Design a protein with these regions (language model features):
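Conserved loop/turn motif of beta-propeller repeat scaffolds
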Residues: 1, 58-59, 98, 172, ...
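Hydrophobic beta-strand positions that form the internal "hydrophobic ladder"
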Residues: 1-4, 62, 101, 184
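Short, conserved, GDST-rich strand-edge loop motifs in beta-rich repeat architectures
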Residues: 7-21, 104-133, 187-205
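Beta-propeller blade signature
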Residues: 21-31, 75-79, 131-143, 200-206
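Predominantly a core beta-strand signature of beta-propeller blades
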Residues: 32-37, 81-84, 144-148
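Asp-box/WD-like beta-propeller blade repeats and closely related beta-sheet repeat scaffolds
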Residues: 43-135, 148-165
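Loop-centered beta-sheet repeat module
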Residues: 163-206
Length: 206
C-alpha cells in the first residue's frame, strides 16, 4: 500500500500517563515519506500503541483507540474524506472481514499488567477478583453496539485442574481472531495475593 500508519510522541524512557497525548498519522511512501497527521489519542501504551490499524477489506478506513471523558472509545476514520465517527468502546482485535471486533477491559489490564492497558481511567472493579460485568466484548464495527460474551466471573468459575484459584484476581489479555473469523483466542490470566504462590506458575512447563 501507499500509506504506513504510525504514531508520534515527544518523550521516551517512561510509561505514559492518562494525560499524555500521542499523534496519529501516516507516512506517504509515494511522496518522499511525508508525514500526514490524522488525529490524536489519549489511550495508548508502548506495548501495543493505540491499536492503530487499517480495517480489513478497505484501503481507506483506519481505526484507533482514544479516551473520551471517562470512557475508552474507538475512532474510525476514512483517510480519503477525513470523515470520522466514534464507537463507544475501545477495540482489541478485528475480524478478517472487518465487520467485528473483540475487546477486553483496558482499565483492568492496566491495573493488573501495567504497560498493556491504558492509564487515565481507574478500574471500577479493582477490588473484585472476578467481576460479572467485565470480560470480553464482541463489537459490531458498523453500528458500534457491543455485547459481553464471556465475563471474568464465568471463566473463574471453571475449575482449575492444577490449583484452586478462587482467591486469585483474574483478567483477559491478548485477543486474536483466527484466519476465517469463525473463532478467536485469548489469554486468561490470574494472580494470587501471595507472591510465592504466583512464582509456581512463572516457569510451568520449563
Amino acid at each position: 500500500g501507499r500509506y504506513v500508519l504510525s504514531m508520534q510522541t515527544d518523550f521516551q524512557h517512561r510509561s505514559p500517563t492518562g494525560d499524555d497525548v500521542i499523534k496519529i498519522g501516516m507516512v506517504d511512501l509515494e511522496d518522499g515519506c511525508k508525514w500526514i497527521e490524522l488525529g490524536k489519542s489519549e489511550a495508548w501504551g508502548w506495548q501495543q500503541g493505540c491499536q492503530l490499524q487499517f480495517i480489513p477489506g478497505t484501503d481507506s478506513k483506519v481505526l484507533w483507540n482514544d479516551k473520551e471523558g471517562d470512557n475508552f472509545v474507538c475512532r474510525i476514520m476514512d483517510i480519503k474524506t477525513r470523515e470520522m465517527r466514534t464507537i463507544p468502546r475501545a477495540v482489541y482485535a478485528l475480524s478478517p472481514d472487518g465487520k467485528w471486533a473483540v475487546t477486553t477491559d483496558y482499565r483492568r489490564v492496566n491495573d493488573t499488567r501495567p504497560g498493556y492497558g491504558y492509564a487515565g481511567i481507574p478500574d471500577p472493579n479493582r477490588d473484585v477478583l472476578a467481576p460479572e460485568d467485565s470480560g470480553i466484548w464482541r463489537i459490531n464495527l458498523e453500528t458500534g453496539e457491543s455485547e459481553l460474551i464471556i465475563s471474568l466471573a464465568q471463566i473463574a468459575a471453571i475449575p482449575n485442574p492444577l490449583d484452586d484459584y478462587s482467591e486469585a484476581k483474574h483478567w483477559f489479555n491478548h485477543l486474536l481472531y483466527n484466519t476465517d473469523g469463525s473463532r478467536f483466542e485469548f489469554l486468561h490470566r490470574w494472580r494470587f495475593p501471595d507472591s510465592l504462590r504466583n512464582a509456581q506458575y512463572e516457569d510451568v512447563g520449563g
